Amino acid sequence: MGKEDKTHINVVVIGHVDSGKSTTTGHLIYKCGGIDKRTIEKFEKEAAELGKGSFKYAWVLDKLKAERERGITIDIALWKFETPKYYVTVIDAPGHRDFIKNMITGTSQADCAILIIAAGTGEFEAGISKDGQTREHALLAYTLGVKQLIVAINKMDTTKWSEARFNEIIKETSNFIKKVGYNPKTVAFVPISGFNGDNMLEASTNCPWYKGWEKEVKGGKATGKTLLEAIDSIEPPKRPTDKPLRLPLQDVYKIGGIGTVPVGRIETGILKPGMVVTFAPSNVTTEVKSVEMHHEQLSEGVPGDNVGFNVKNVSVKEIRRGNVAGDSKNDPPLGAASFDAQVIVLNHPGQVGAGYAPVLDCHTAHIACKFAELLQKIDRRTGKAVEESPKFIKSGDAAIVKMIPSKPMCVEAFTEYPPLGRFAVRDMRQTVAVGVIKKVEKAAAGSGKVTKSAAKAGGKK
């Protein structure tokens, strides 16, 4: 396969705080990854000087994370690694303060979640206990449409590579992920040591009893021994190029000599120079002069591309972060007057009733929305209603809620445009709930601003 032919996939790594996520992820990036040798040598030297030699893989990640938190790394290449079949991007290194928020508003949908479980006595139990983070992260991944899962059972060296312990953990974890919604038969369970490297890229000699993992896939079975092979057995995603354009703006820049340049990630559809786009909810329509990525002109941008595009006769004051660009001729985006969403309350100290008005983070928008009406309480796993018009909901509950944004915002139904149909509910500096939008009541399309160039471009086509 030529270098360019590989499919790009996104994975999210979840698990308890001490499961060894950083070490395992660091190891993959380190061995197959986008970090150049010079950087690694620099990290190793620093780690040794600080007496942190034993943490070298985690250290790689800590350094990257520190840079990311300080806003230095625009260069996400560091978070990439390559398998024989895929280019893999680690969407979020957990342990990050805003992991839950990032996963929802996150720059992209994960194609697969890798759940890392620590095999050590007591460690495993802590990780999947009732209030464990692991449960919350796994539930979140499932709710947000990440339907593929790999389970890596880490720190097997601390159990002296005990087959009995491995089987016990598979049994417990299978029950656990089944409750969340995953089918264990479709999941690869891989015993690893993220630190020593066993079964990461090459089969380990420390577990002669281990015959390999197997899982059901469309049209048969997939088998393998290592975590890398398990990642390669992820079913490739269908990228939504055939859907109408949706591009949530991350920023809008004013660049001397060029003009107004909105920047964001194409979630669905295609963006080309010469297209006439409409921004919602600000209701501005204009022509796209040029599209670029990494300082190179593009003839077209596709889903997943982070692009900047130059628009004619629109000032920086008219469009802003949180607006969504779409094709004015093909299902253009509109503001939402209200929307119904399935909301899962994760951790709210009290009860949530009608009138509650927290901030919603949906794609790049950050806007207060009122819980106008609790329509029904539902069973989280089946989605069936268990109570009509409940008075309030509390932690652990799921409900269908009618929501009204406090100011114009553009959202979509999850089934139509997934990245614009999931949100985090933020209150008290944490994520108190997550939601998936079922249907949207669009605001009436008023007569917005249409620039001259848009009218002209619209006329000639």
From Swiss-Prot:
Region (G5): 193-195
CDD domains: EF1_alpha (cd01883), EF1_alpha_II (cd03693), EF1_alpha_III (cd03705)
N6-methyllysine: residues carrying this PTM: K3, K31, K317, K391
tr-type G domain mapped to chain residues: 6-241
Keyword flag Cytoplasm: yes
Chain positions covered by the region annotation G4: 154-157
Stretches for region G3: 92-95
GO cellular component: cytoplasm
One family name in Pfam for this protein: GTP_EFTU_D2
Subcellular location: Cytoplasm
Keyword Protein biosynthesis: yes
Residues where N6,N6-dimethyllysine is found: K3, K317
Function: This protein promotes the GTP-dependent binding of aminoacyl-tRNA to the A-site of ribosomes during protein biosynthesis.
Listed HAMAP family: EF_Tu_A (MF_00118_A)
Alphabetical list of NCBIfam families matching this protein: EF-1_alpha, PRK12317.1
Name used for this protein in its record: Elongation factor 1-alpha
Organism: Pseudoechria curvicolla (Podospora curvicolla)
